């Protein structure tokens, strides 16, 4: 399973990547590097699943998923938050 991480906090990205790799849950095919999510980058990575931070400063997770759904309805999205 190919996993892309959309998260604005680099420490959370690193933790998620460590857990996913240690547990053998899938292959990390990319992350947004703590920057605002770029839909084109996500699509280019061809993920099966996108982990999406619910609260992000530029575009929140719900907005991102709505945008993703306009061009791809097969990628699974899992909303995450560190609240």
What are these regions (language model features)?
Residues 56:
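Receiver (REC) domain active-site loop signature in two-component systems and cognate sites
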Residues 46-48, 72-76:
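His-Asp phosphorelay/catalytic-motif detector in bacterial-type signaling
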Residues 62-74:
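Short amphipathic alpha-helix used as the core "switch/output" element in two-component signaling
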Residues 34, 60-63:
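Acidic catalytic/metal-coordinating carboxylates
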Residues 53:
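Active-site residues of response regulator receiver
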Residues 9-30:
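Two-component/phosphorelay signaling modules centered on CheY-like receiver
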Residues 31-49:
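Acidic, metal-coordinating helix/loop segments flanking the phosphotransfer/catalytic sites
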């Amino acid at each position: 399973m190919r996993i892309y991480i959309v998260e604005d906090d680099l420490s959370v990205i690193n933790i998620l990547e460590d857990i996913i790799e240690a547990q053998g849950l899938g292959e990390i095919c990319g992350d947004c590097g703590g920057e605002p999510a770029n839909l084109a980058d996500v699509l280019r990575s061809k993920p099966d699943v996108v982990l999406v931070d619910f609260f992000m400063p530029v575009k929140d997770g719900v907005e991102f998923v709505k945008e993703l759904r306009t061009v791809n309805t097969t990628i699974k999205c899992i909303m995450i938050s560190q609240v």
